[in-house]
Structure formats: structure tokens, C-alpha cells
Amino acid sequence: MKLSYLPSEFQKALPVLEKIKAAGFEAYFVGGSVRDALLNRPIHDVDIASSSYPEETKQIFERTVDIGIEHGTVLVLENGGEYEVTTFRTEDVYVDYRRPSSVSFVRSLEEDLKRRDFTVNAFALNENAEVIDKFNGLADLDNRVLRAVGKAEERFNEDALRIMRGLRFAASLDFDIEEKTFEAMTSHAFLLEKISIERSFIEFDKLLLAPHWKKGIKALLATKAYQYLPDFQETAEEWQSFVADYAEDFRFTSSEQAWAATLLALKHDNPRSFLKKWKTSVNFQKTVQSLIEIFRFRMEREVTKQDVYHYGKDLLKEAETLRQAQRLDVDYERIAELDGQLLIHDKHEIVVNGGKLMKELGFKPGPDLGRTLKAIENAIVDGKLANDEESIMAFVQAMKQV
């Protein structure tokens, strides 16, 4: 098969291919970028595979960086871009169900493509826009099927993370998982316990943000892979409710929103503790926790000025979007209106600080000063006190007389 044209992302990288070929080696575009070109999807990273060994690649180009030379990868800086050029290779026995014990460089493209995970990721593309398809990936692409390259059991036993990648591809591409591939994913799902939490997080996060995330969750449920992810041992009913709760075409707008929705559906009592186990950042944990808090109090009451001040309008709107996707009442206008009424959005905007109160009104550092500053802040947020020095000092004087 031949593409009708070579997309601009490949055209920009074409000089790299041409230089490698001029030096007497083979070179092709490979991986997800070729798949995405065939599906008319946006192309991101352009990867190149070559029969040239790393040292040979480095001799061809003036500017290179060793970014994974032990695995055959050299970063080539050419034509204003950065391109990973990886030597054709085969892989030895895998250790820890994730990494090969060693790699061997080879001169055969087919040997290199054999080690890929799925047939739709095992294409190569030459400089003439001709697609090399050794494993009937084009047929799978036409039929929207996700199929492992070769024996599925071997692929997942080599690298258990491919199970999560498969679920993610089903969600991002809207592909059905081929029967034998699905069976192998199910029978090898227990190996996910061997995979680092950080890598599992990346794949599950991409699944949640995919356009067809519901398909990915359904496959996660069907393969029972969720049972081998940290703290995801909920019942099938809770996972099914997660899918059912949201409108069919709803897409999450951020990772934080997606994880908040997940934890709400699964009824986790301690989101911060859960997210720590997934080794997420403190800021990520705080944002997810805040979204969950907002969603829960919105089931009981309206948004207040204090809510807008504490959480910020953007986070409130993000939580409101989850309500909208669940067909619940929303009030974006109220959030915007209250935000417009706020005299301050941060306590540092208050014109009187603790130093001034100590200097002019005799306050000492301690709980009394802290309570007074908090009272000032709350009164300004509630619109009961103007944010000017005269009003604030009078407010404090009145407090002291009570």
C-alpha cells in the first residue's frame, strides 16, 4: 500500500532517512506515527528505525545525543528537529515482565517489527510513502481490530504493560480487541502486579483521557485487569456504574477531573491516600481531593462566595462539568457572578497584614493574631468589609472591644 502523500511531519524528517540511505543503510519511519497517518489522525513523535548500528548512525550525522545507545537509540538533531533513530534489533528473554535481559542489533527490518506489541503498531513507512506491513496490520486497521503481533501470550508475558497499552489503544482508537489477544490479556492480567505503579498510572491516565474511555473501562472490567492495579479491587458493579453515570459522548478535560470522577464512582473514602499509592504529586492529590469535595457538597447546596474564594472559579467549573455529564443541575453563571463580586482572590491582596496590626494595635504573634487575620479575610470575602486600611483597622478595633 502507498499513502497518497507523505504527511508534513515525515517530510520534515525525510533528510534523516535520505542521509542514512545514502550511507548504504536501510531506514524507515515506524511505530504509532505511521498508524496515525493511515488513520488520518494527528501525528506526534516521528520515530525512525535503521539497519545502521548506533556508532554508524553517529558517524552519518554531525549532531547526535546518546539517549539510549545500549538499546540502539540515538537522538539525531537535523533540519531543526529531533529524531530518535533506533537500530533494528531483537530482544532476549524478558526480566521482571517488562524489560529484555539484552538486545541484539540486526540488519533485518522484519526481525525488528516482530518485537512490536500490536499489528497496527508494526508498520514501517519508506521515503516513497510505501507502507511495509509484515503482519496484516492494514487488514486489522480496516476492521478496527487490535491484535497482538505473533503469539499474544508471548507478547504479554514479555511485557505485561502491553495489557494496559492494549486497553488504552482500544479507548483511543475505538478498536475492538481480537479474541485471542483478549484471552491472553485476561489470562496474563495478574502480571500487572509486577509493573511499576508509575507506568501503570501513565497508561490508565491516557485511557481515561481518550475519546472512547468507556470502551477502555469496559475492557478493563472484562479482562479483570483492574483487580491487579493498586487499590482498584472494587466490585464489577461499581465499575459498571462509573461507565453508566456519564453521558455517552462525555470526555474528561484534565487528568485531575478524570481521576476525581473515578474515585467518586468507586466511592473511595480517602482519595489522598489512594493517590499516594499511585505515586502522584502532592499538587495532583490536592486538586483531585478538591474536585471530589466540590462535587460532594454540590449534591447538598449551592456554591458560595467562600467556595469561589477557596477553590477558585476554574476548579468549580471543572467539577460542575462532571455534574452536567451526569445530567445534574449546573450553575456556571452563579460561579462567574460570585467570582466577579469577590473583593480579593488571595489573602495576600488584603491591604493590612499582621505586621501592621502588631505595630499599630499591639498584637503579639500567636493564636489571637491568627484569628483576627482570618476574621478580616472572611469578612472581606463575604462582602461585609471593604479592603481598605481605614475600614479594616476600625473592624479590628471593634473586635477588640467585644
From Swiss-Prot:
InterPro entries noted in UniProt: Bact_CCA-adding_enz_type3_sf (IPR050264), CCA-adding_enz_C (IPR032810), CCA-adding_enz_firmicutes (IPR023068), NT_sf (IPR043519), PolA_pol_head_dom (IPR002646), PolyA_RNA-bd (IPR032828)
Protein name per Swiss-Prot or TrEMBL: CCA-adding enzyme
Function of the molecule: Catalyzes the addition and repair of the essential 3'-terminal CCA sequence in tRNAs without using a nucleic acid template. Adds these three nucleotides in the order of C, C, and A to the tRNA nucleotide-73, using CTP and ATP as substrates and producing inorganic pyrophosphate. tRNA 3'-terminal CCA addition is required both for tRNA processing and repair. Also involved in tRNA surveillance by mediating tandem CCA addition to generate a CCACCA at the 3' terminus of unstable tRNAs. While stable tRNAs receive only 3'-terminal CCA, unstable tRNAs are marked with CCACCA and rapidly degraded.
This enzyme's EC code(s): 2.7.7.72
Binding site for ATP: 32, 35, 116, 159, 162, 165, 168
Family label: Belongs to the tRNA nucleotidyltransferase/poly(A) polymerase family. Bacterial CCA-adding enzyme type 3 subfamily.
Organism: Streptococcus thermophilus (strain ATCC BAA-491 / LMD-9)
Note: A single active site specifically recognizes both ATP and CTP and is responsible for their addition.
Keyword annotations: ATP-binding, Magnesium, Metal-binding, Nucleotide-binding, Nucleotidyltransferase, RNA repair, RNA-binding, Transferase, tRNA processing
Binding site for Mg(2+): 45, 47
HAMAP family, sorted: CCA_bact_type3
Binding, CTP: 32, 35, 116, 159, 162, 165, 168
